[in-house]
UniProtKB/Swiss-Prot annotation:
Keywords: Host-virus interaction, Membrane, Viral attachment to host cell, Viral attachment to host cell pilus, Viral envelope protein, Virion, Virus entry into host cell. P3 protein is necessary for adsorption onto host cells. Attaches to a type IV pilus of the host. Its main location: virion. The gene is P3. It is a peripheral membrane protein. Interacts with P6. One of its GO terms (cellular component) is membrane. It comes from the Viruses. This is Spike protein P3.
């Protein structure tokens, strides 16, 4: 039975009572809603065909303002029985089709955060969109303060009964509140309006999902995220429900393509679910810091942007807010080019907002299959070239054959049998390393193993191939990578990247990256321009207007951040708190020695401005995340916001 979990927890029919009174009786049925049930839903002003109420107070009027979806069950709220309609009004697993995995909202404690506006959204009124079932763990007043936002079914654990507490702890899989990792949310101040605070939600163990409650008050909006922990990695999906009334831009931040499926469609005529960002990294705190996240407190998480793990230094959780607008297309197609549209679009920035849509930047092994990367490089005497990083990929025969073909065309000697044998051994050891990384619970030990092995592997490859042959005009070399080849571990996620190194002045043209997400989305990108660090530890790939871009000269350390992003270290206290910390924390990496190309030129060339990916070698991928996150955000903000916030 699809809804066995919640039936077991709730015991069929269950009454939940808080200090504020009875929430309501809940009844579940596996049968699709009947015509009569749909008619009854209409009678209480629910929009047939869209998610409707689940758990709410006995007051049916309140229920109209608290939409939440669990499937196609029928839930009784007071005397009314209200159908829980599938996402598009069908009877199948619409949620699974929507996000690519089984519905995570089968039980009450997971049932907050996803709702849809009523038909009135077409007039710009969002009165129906207020997700319910916020489970408060702090104080009764906190719950009361959230009634308008989350409905009347806030559970006040401070004064709740032992039975209620036991129910929630069973549902959560951990004791409350001490043993739970609280959620994150990112508050974003949209241009032209203040933002209503969003609140940290209790995380549900094992689900790397994020829902985005969205409320519009004169253009205000917010995004909140739950960040669970699973093994050695933490994942964040930041989503935004973007909307726009006639003649107005929709609000959102164009970031990156996340792990969601196919055509996301329109929820209503003016609604669209847009995935913004996917991060999988053990240092999520520092990532969110780059996105403007600040530390919250257990006593009042509303005062700041994040309720953070207390073991994380507060100094690492602060940073600038990010502003932006985006005008979404009518639907997101199943095939998503990168980018979907140039910055500006018809009317230019400020007229319709920046039309920059999901851009894939990282996380290949987690979501991708049959990934290929093809590139054409003109190399100089330094001798490095578009080659696969065999520390991370299994070096395949296609790539070898292509290199040999180029070598032969240049009158060079192809790989010897000995070199082939050594390369084969390297492939085996790399695969073995992946297996090592897929077991065990200590991320530091994994990191240590990974870094030692990858360094040795890279040295071997460098000595035997790169230094022996200066490849010129490398044609369309294909690098294939099996999905989850590295076991899905974060330490390898960040290394499953296109490796370019030590180019120092080379030009790269026509980089083509294609792949299929595990959930079915096909994505691709074609553009030119390359920026890399001359140091082997780091590489930054910047996709410009499709024209070759030479590396800049070395930059003074103090100017590196400002040069790249148009902001200074003083603007990013959570990113770079001091020069001393930067030098030690980043191991003389990206911010010190990178040869950086100024992406402000991208903003100037708004019709063809792309920024694709950042690569980092070591476990402190923090600086890479900062680079890609801020660069993407910079390109996604409106002209006014850019000037006000970044001085561009």
């Amino acid at each position: 039975m699809r809804y066995q979990g919640i039936n077991e927890w709730l015991g069929g029919a269950k009454k939940l009572t808080t200090a504020n009174g009875e929430i309501g009786a809940i009844y579940l049925s596996a049968a699709p809603p009947t015509d009569a049930a749909r008619a009854d839903a209409k009678a209480v002003d629910f929009t047939a065909g869209w998610p409707s109420a689940i758990v709410d107070c006995a007051d049916a009027t309140r229920a109209k303002q608290n939409y939440l979806w669990v499937g196609d069950n029928v839930v009784h709220i007071g005397a009314k029985h209200v159908p829980l309609l599938d996402l598009w009004g069908g009877t199948g697993d619409a949620w699974q089709q929507f996000v690519g995995y089984a519905c995570p909202m089968l039980d009450l404690c997971r049932a907050w955060g996803l709702g849809y506006a009523s038909a009135s959204v077409t007039t710009g009124s969002l009165q129906g969109y207020q997700p319910s079932a916020f489970l408060d763990v702090e104080q009764q007043q906190f719950a009361k303060d959230n009634l308008n936002l989350y409905g009347d079914n806030c559970l006040d654990l401070a004064t709740s009964s032992s039975a209620q507490r036991a129910f929630l702890e069973q549902c959560m899989g951990c004791a409350l509140p001490e043993d739970c990792i609280f959620g994150w949310y990112v508050k974003m101040d949209w241009e032209g309006s203040a933002v209503a605070d969003a609140y940290a939600a209790i995380r549900v163990q094992g689900f790397a999902t994020v829902m985005a409650p969205w409320q519009s008050v004169g253009g205000a909006g917010y995004v909140y995220a739950r960040v669970p922990q699973k093994g050695a990695w933490m994942g964040v999906n930041l989503l935004a429900y973007v909307h726009g009334t006639s003649g107005q831009p929709a609000y959102g931040i164009p970031m990156t393509l996340s792990g969601f499926t196919g055509n996301m469609g329109q929820v209503a005529s003016k609604w669209l679910m847009l995935p913004l960002l996917m991060i999988v990294d053990p240092h999520v705190v520092q990532i969110l810091a780059a996105l403007g996240v600040k530390r919250g407190t257990k006593s009042d998480p509303r005062t700041t942007d994040v309720y953070a793990d207390p073991k994380v230094p507060a100094s690492r959780i602060s940073g600038p807010m990010i502003n932006g607008t985006v005008a979404p297309p009518a639907t997101i197609p199943a095939t998503i080019p990168v980018p979907l549209a140039p910055l500006g679009g018809a009317g230019g920035p400020g007229a319709q907002g920046f039309q920059v849509y999901p851009v894939f930047t990282w996380g290949l092994p987690e979501f991708m299959t049959d990934v290929t990367i093809e590139g054409t490089v003109t190399a100089d005497s330094n001798g490095l070239h578009v080659v696969d990083d065999v520390r991370n990929y299994v070096w395949n025969g296609t790539a070898l054959a292509a290199i040999e073909q180029v070598n032969a065309a240049d009158g060079r000697v192809t790989l010897t049998d000995s070199e082939r044998a050594q390369l084969a051994s390297l492939t085996v050891r790399t695969a073995s390393l992946r297996q090592q990384l897929s077991v065990g619970a200590d991320p530091l030990s994994k990191t240590s193993i990974w870094r030692r092995a990858q360094k040795a592997d890279y040295d071997l490859l460098s000595q035997q191939i790169i230094e022996a042959d200066t490849v010129k005009n490398l044609p369309a070399v294909t690098f294939a990578q099996a999905n989850k080849a590295a076991g899905g571990q974060s330490e390898t996620l960040w290394h499953q990247m296109y490796r370019v190194n030590d180019i120092a002045g080379d030009q790269v043209t026509a980089i083509q990256i294609t792949g299929t997400m595990a959930t079915g989305i096909r994505w691709s990108a074609t553009a030119g321009g390359l920026v890399v660090d001359a140091d082997e530890q780091d590489a930054v790939i910047a996709i410009s207007s499709g024209k070759p871009v030479k590396n800049s000269s070395d930059l003074p350390t103090a100017d590196a951040v400002n040069y790249l992003f148009g902001i200074t270290a003083d603007d990013m206290p959570g990113i770079v708190s001091s020069q001393k910390e930067m030098n030690s924390e980043f191991e003389e990496g990206f911010l010190q020695k990178a040869r950086l190309w100024n992406p402000r030129k991208l903003v100037e060339n708004v019709q063809n401005a792309y920024f694709l990916m950042v690569y980092a070698r070591d476990r402190k991928q923090f600086h890479s995340l900062v680079a890609s996150s801020l660069a993407m955000a910079k390109l996604g903000v409106s002209t006014r916001a850019c000037k006000e916030s970044y001085g561009c």
